[in-house]
């Protein structure tokens, strides 16, 4: 059941047309907690309504997200998806609803809809990042799992001219892309193009460094594009454990899934009868390092 929207009479001037330009059909445009009256030409369809939403709320609408327009149906007492071919003929209430929060919170992982992102596991970070050796070990195990299951892998290197290449322990065999970057987020134009080439991508499994910088900014940018993000807690770290802790807490509050290197491959196979289960079982037979990453600070 949709949350109650402000009544027409409660709006300024006592009507949805109040404050709306004359000569059109009055419509109440609702988005998030806001409701603004405006008017549109008689017969206005979906494209016109979207443009009106953008003119009213453009500074608040993330254009990378997917939305649905809904119409308040008096018959049902709640909002329903805008009927196909809808055209405005009388005053009505519409709302713009972002889809990805509702559609991507279950946390299911399947090989055809998943991509692995390995972020900036470079040699120059070795002395500075807490438990770097442990996250290299766990990251390498994740990449082995990706190869077993045929999952695409994208790797970035932050300013490799100054910070060096990906550490030698990370096996790049079969990796889809290895890209240099200066931007903190991994969401580069080349990465977006690569994702567009993979049909049905819904989830990204993300790991690397630093948790509170490149990992955090990558995760938030991906979520803004409607992609579900799983951050592997035992494969990400920072120079400061406090930075790492608060970044993971913040990301979890935004709906990003914080998981582990054992949970990910088991979720991907999902069944002991999966043809690759034995290989995954052998991969995770030895537990991940019990490092200080378990500490909060």
Swiss-Prot record:
The modification N6-succinyllysine is found at residue 278. The modification Phosphotyrosine is found at residue 159. Keywords: Phosphoprotein. Induction: Down-regulated after nephrectomy. Specifically expressed in spleen and kidney. One of its GO terms (cellular component) is cytoplasm. Belongs to the isochorismatase family. PANTHER family: HYDROLASE, ISOCHORISMATASE DOMAIN-CONTAINING PROTEIN 1. This is Isochorismatase domain-containing protein 1. It comes from Rattus norvegicus (Rat). The gene is Isoc1.
